[in-house]
Amino acid sequence: MNGLARAKLMDKLMTVVFYCVAGFFILLLVSLALYVIGNGFRNFSFSLISFEGSGLGNLLFNTLYLVFLSLLVSVPLGVAAGIYMAEYAKAGRFTRFLRMCIETMSSLPSIVVGLFGYLVFIVMTGAQWNLFSGALAVSILSIPLIMTVTEDAFKSLPEGYKRGSLAMGATLWQTIYKVLLPACLPRIMTGVILAAGRGFGEAAALLYTAGMSTDISWSSWNLLSPTCPLNPFRPGETLALSIWAARTEALAANSAQLANLASAILMLLVLSFSLGARCLSSYLDTKSGGSK
């Protein structure tokens, strides 16, 4: 067998290998999703997702509300930090030190972030466990991700975007706000999706900060009330925390069933949020003229 035939055979062999690897991961994801969702909705009844008793309705609301609060904090800070690193930061010791700090933050174990949040947001402030402290803890984990995605998005744009805008007399900030940022929105949305997904499934950081209460009064809309649904300074148990509690404490008779259903709901939340955000990202990409 000559060298050319050997190279073609190796090319076909590696193509088959890579297709098999891709198929394995697709099969793994589909199998996991079907198992979790099927196991969760087995013997399903609407009482399990009610907003009373041991139903998961309040936990679902707490999860969505906490993710919303964390994105309110992490998205502006992460995008601003990414813009600074891409457009304003100069090469030097300070920038290298800042990048090292960001890389360290991104690799911190969530349990360490939770303990930090407990000591700073709870103990030092004298507050009780609350959703906002949990959102801040999740934001610490999300900001490096959003910042890195934003920086990469800005640096991947053609240089002509920036030079053309500056040549027309626009300032650097006008160029960033009106030209570069809209062009980067689809990729920034990817970072937001990943950050939200981490917020949905986070448990260790919330164990020390958000609390385990499900006491919500849907007739009370006074933001100062400890049972008001929209009060960010009330304790709030999330779906991920309920899974941990059901598998460790099992206080309710149907704890295992509730844990399985909570896992299925979390899986559907992440999948639906990712698909919806992907559609929005494609729409923004098309609107900005980035689609091919």
What are these regions (language model features)?
Residues 70-102, 115, 123, 277-286:
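Transmembrane-helix boundary motif in ABC transporter permease subunits
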Residues 48-54, 206-266:
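Interhelical loop and adjacent transmembrane-helix boundary motif
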Residues 103-141:
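Generic hydrophobic transmembrane alpha-helix motif, especially the helices
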Residues 2-20, 34-72, 91, 245-256:
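Periplasmic/extracellular loop-to-transmembrane helix junction in inner-membrane transport proteins
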Residues 71, 149, 172-212:
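Transmembrane alpha-helices
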Residues 61, 65-73, 77, 81, ...:
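Hydrophobic alpha-helical transmembrane segments of multipass integral membrane proteins
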